[in-house]
């Protein structure tokens, strides 16, 4: 099995506490509301939302994928960090066993810096190159920008 790690960092005008509430704690409700073309709905299959919880994310009509299941690995509201692992679904190809994600929001001026790490666990000796994950990164960044825009347009939300 191979392991390929990719890091990404971007900034937001929204401070970590508010962004974490929208981007992590209430994402299952907010994203289908503001971007139904991306995510149709999210449901908890087992657990209470904390570590060990299994969620099923059903993608919207415009997506190339139908669904994924992920397991919450850690969530820390005090440090604004979140980790989960994609464990099932058509986004996992026959060459990828699982994908683990880590995100941490750090205060930066009056906003945030979002640091994310993706770990691709491949089957056999399959190699994953950064250009293979570029489209997914761009979609995730676009979704993040929608959340940020929503928070700017709704200054009383998630305070």
Swiss-Prot record:
PROSITE patterns: PATHOGENESIS_BETVI (PS00451). GO terms for cellular component: cytoplasm; nucleus. GO terms for molecular function: abscisic acid binding; protein phosphatase inhibitor activity; signaling receptor activity. Pfam families: Bet_v_1. It comes from the Eukaryota. InterPro entries: Bet_v_I/MLP (IPR000916), Bet_v_I_allergen (IPR024949), Plant_def-hormone_signal (IPR050279), START-like_dom_sf (IPR023393). GO terms for biological process: abscisic acid-activated signaling pathway; defense response. Keywords: Allergen, Pathogenesis-related protein, Plant defense. Gene3D superfamilies: 3.30.530.20. CDD domains: Bet_v1-like. Belongs to the BetVI family. This is Major allergen Pyr c 1. It comes from Pyrus communis. The lineage of its organism: Eukaryota, Viridiplantae, Streptophyta, Embryophyta, Tracheophyta. The gene is PYRC1.
